[in-house]
């Protein structure tokens, strides 16, 4: 907080480095002299005036690259000057903001006659102005939320260009948000087809607008084709229309694929959005009743102009949240908490038809505002669009570099007995969510050291008791034995484990029936591949310390594996097992000591066990004296595509089979334990594969 005798600023410090082009500055006038307004003055920008209530104010401020000298002056001549520095992070992946037009679009959006008279129409240029300012408000709001969650000043960038900036009443040439005007191949009639309107309960294809937007972007070309990384795009359909019963040409959707991450929305509420910053407070407090003969009352929550602005701006931001990787949450923007988005910019709320009240009392404290859920902000922290330069000075951060197209890495879960398990991630786990009825009700986060955490973890031990203790009592009663676990890692797709408690409810296997000592017990790992495919094989046991060679049967998938081992001399006792050595876990680095393939196995005096099928196509791998198998890497999906053997000497074989098939998974017993055998399911080839592990 920057303090002075007369004015305090709560969320802006002297000489602070800012990465958002727009801020919501919270302040208080300590001098009780009846100040009603505060004006923000900037040497390069027009002044903007904001109201003061109960001595508090919220001022939405635009910044220019470099030094920004901001002076806050009340109408009673109380003043405070502060300097901050804005640095656009052009290296971060931006969001492209787009208006999608039908090929025969009249270039107009829905607007009541009164509003058209006030704003001078409802054409394309006005839509661009409104969308540009709305995007700046989303950036400012998100930056404030990240700051409140102790993650620093961070927000996502939009694509910008040097052109006429319309954020103020008087346009000027400077950097501002670029609005792509994208023509669709579809006509107005096709876009407004009731069958593809999302809110039409009888519609036959209510998700079609998402595909129409995707096709329009790809036809537009430029940044939306032939890119190395997925492109992020937030699109509004200009030709959305309220016909008195249905909003046509509108869908609120967010998601995408590895080429385009996409959010779409309709323009049915755009009439209520401000066109410039000077209109921000008047538009957020405009109690004019919506005329449903002219414009839509979306979800019956847009009874006034200001409520329409709040709902539609917030709902579009909700879809951008999906674009940025956020699922629905139990609270906040990703639930439907954006019905109070207006409060983040105001110190006094207007009358709400939706609630039949004047809402929060002045000056509207942060606890009464809409929020990004904590889990959203953690996702943003590990999203490439939110990167800060100083993140790279913290080795524990493991900064993400990809928006999609990840290597298909599967997390490994190893039950340990007693309701506990070990979770492995090759890239580092930063968040574990406990999912009850599709919503996260508890979580464990691994923030970087610079933000007070321990950094993403490649190995985590969790217990059912700890996970259940993180659930609210009502959720625990309903879902304590059935909750899902969702694991998020850096540069990797999310992984969900259904009915997670049952996964840990394992019964140790008595391994004495397989030739081990009486006290040896084994635990089955989860199966990778198709866990309901083929036929169950049971346990194929072997003493890994006696294995000298492996024969892998493979073609375009894994057919089988035969383990050759020395027979233990009669009458000898098991030697005490020493702790197996653990090689480095960087399986993506270049392999310099690979096991020799196609070696001839001398089968004399060797026994063997077979998992799967024996075929004419195989590769042999021979172990060195004292070398044991400590794990396997797999490529798997609907079956097991390929297998790689890892040894205690830090060596790995090639990936035998279809090395480009499926996703990557690893199987290794917990530290101090050994592989006691393998298990899985086999059909025409190996459908699923797992290990048995335990102490020796």
Curated annotation (Swiss-Prot):
Keyword GTP-binding attached: no
Predominant subcellular localization, coarse grouping: cytoplasm
Pfam families registered for this protein in UniProt: Jacalin, Metallopep
GO CC annotation: cytoplasm
Occurrences of domain Jacalin-type lectin (ranges): 522-695
EC number: 3.4.24.-
Database matches in InterPro entries: Jacalin-like_lectin_dom, Jacalin-like_lectin_dom_sf, Jacalin-like_metallopeptidase, Metalloproteinase_M10B, Unchr_Zn-peptidase-like
Superkingdom per UniProt: Eukaryota
Subcellular location: Cytoplasm
Cofactor: Zn(2+)
Per UniProt, location of the Glycyl lysine isopeptide (Lys-Gly) (interchain with G-Cter in ubiquitin) cross-link in this chain: 245, 478, 518, 579, 590, 596
Binding-site list for Zn(2+): 318, 322, 328
Modified residues (Phosphoserine): 361
Classification via CDD domains: Jacalin_metallopeptidase_like (cd09613)
One of the protein's GO biological processes: proteolysis
Additional free-text comment from the UniProt record: Present with 195 molecules/cell in log phase SD medium.
Family in the record: Belongs to the peptidase M10B family.
Protein name per UniProt: Putative zinc metalloproteinase YIL108W
Native species: Saccharomyces cerevisiae (strain ATCC 204508 / S288c)
């Amino acid at each position: 907080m920057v303090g002075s005798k007369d004015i305090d600023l709560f969320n802006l410090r002297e000489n602070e480095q800012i990465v958002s082009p727009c801020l919501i500055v919270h302040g208080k006038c300590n001098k009780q002299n009846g100040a009603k307004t505060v004006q923000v003055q900037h040497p390069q920008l027009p002044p903007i005036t904001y109201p003061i209530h109960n001595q508090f104010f919220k001022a939405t401020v635009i910044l220019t690259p470099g030094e920004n000298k901001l002076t806050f002056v009340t109408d009673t001549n109380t003043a405070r000057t502060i300097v901050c520095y804005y640095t656009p992070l052009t290296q971060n992946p931006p969001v492209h903001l787009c208006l999608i037009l039908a090929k025969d679009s009249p270039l107009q959006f829905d607007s009541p006659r009164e509003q058209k008279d006030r704003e001078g129409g409802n054409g394309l240029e006005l839509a661009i102005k409104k969308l540009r300012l709305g995007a700046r408000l989303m950036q400012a709001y998100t930056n404030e939320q990240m700051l409140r969650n102790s993650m620093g000043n961070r927000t996502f960038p939009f694509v910008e260009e040097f052109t006429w900036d319309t954020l103020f009443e008087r346009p000027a040439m400077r950097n501002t948000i670029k609005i792509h005007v994208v023509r669709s191949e579809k006509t107005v009639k096709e876009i407004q087809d009731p069958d593809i309107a999302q809110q039409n309960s009888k519609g036959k294809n209510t998700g079609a607008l998402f595909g129409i937007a995707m096709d329009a972007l790809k036809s537009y070309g430029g940044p939306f084709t032939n890119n190395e990384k997925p492109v992020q795009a937030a699109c509004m359909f200009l030709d959305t229309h309220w016909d008195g019963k249905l909003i046509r040409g509108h869908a609120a959707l967010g998601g995408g694929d590895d080429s385009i991450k996409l959010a779409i929305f309709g323009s049915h509420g755009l009439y209520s959005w401000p066109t410039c910053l000077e209109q921000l407070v008047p538009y957020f407090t405009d109690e004019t009743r919506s005329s449903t003969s002219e414009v839509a009352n979306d979800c019956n929550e847009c009874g006034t102009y200001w409520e329409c602005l709040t709902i539609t701006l917030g709902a579009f931001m909700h879809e951008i949240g999906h674009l940025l990787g956020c699922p629905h949450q139990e609270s906040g923007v990703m639930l439907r908490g954006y019905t109070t988005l207006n409060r983040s910019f105001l110190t006094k709320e207007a009358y709400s038809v939706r609630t039949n009240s004047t809402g929060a009392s002045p000056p509207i404290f942060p606890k009464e505002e809409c929020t990004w859920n904590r889990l959203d902000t953690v996702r943003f922290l590990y999203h490439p669009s939110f990167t800060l330069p100083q993140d790279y000075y913290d080795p524990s951060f493991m900064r993400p570099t990809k928006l999609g197209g990840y290597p298909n890495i599967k997390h490994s879960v190893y039950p340990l007995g007693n309701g506990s398990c070990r979770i492995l991630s090759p890239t580092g786990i930063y968040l574990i969510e406990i999912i009850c009825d599709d919503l996260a009700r508890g979580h464990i986060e691994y923030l970087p050291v610079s933000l007070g955490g321990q950094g993403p973890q490649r190995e985590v031990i969790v217990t059912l008791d700890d996970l259940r203790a993180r659930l609210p009592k009502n959720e625990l009663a309903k879902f304590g034995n059935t909750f899902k676990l969702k694991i998020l890692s850096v540069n990797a797709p999310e992984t969900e484990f259904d009915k997670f408690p049952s996964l840990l409810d394992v019964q140790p296997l008595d391994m004495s029936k397989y030739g081990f000592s009486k006290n040896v017990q084994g635990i089955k790992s989860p199966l990778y591949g198709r866990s309901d495919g083929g036929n169950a094989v049971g346990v194929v046991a072997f003493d890994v310390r006696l294995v000298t060679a492996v024969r892998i049967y493979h073609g375009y998938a894994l057919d089988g594996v035969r383990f050759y081992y020395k027979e233990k001399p009669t009458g000898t006792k098991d030697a005490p097992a020493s702790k197996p050595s653990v090689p480095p876990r960087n399986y993506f680095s270049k392999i310099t000591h690979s096991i020799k393939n196609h070696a001839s196995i001398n089968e004399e005096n060797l026994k063997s066990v077979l998992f799967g099928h024996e075929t004419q196509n195989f590769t042999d791998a021979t172990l060195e004296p004292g070398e044991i198998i400590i794990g396997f890497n797999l490529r798997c999906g609907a079956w097991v595509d390929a297998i790689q053997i890892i040894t205690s000497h830090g060596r790995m074989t090639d990936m035998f089979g279809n090395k480009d098939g499926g996703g990557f998974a690893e199987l290794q017993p917990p530290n101090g334990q050994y592989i006691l055998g393998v298990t899985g399911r086999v059909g025409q080839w190996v459908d699923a594969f797992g290990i048995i592990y335990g102490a020796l």
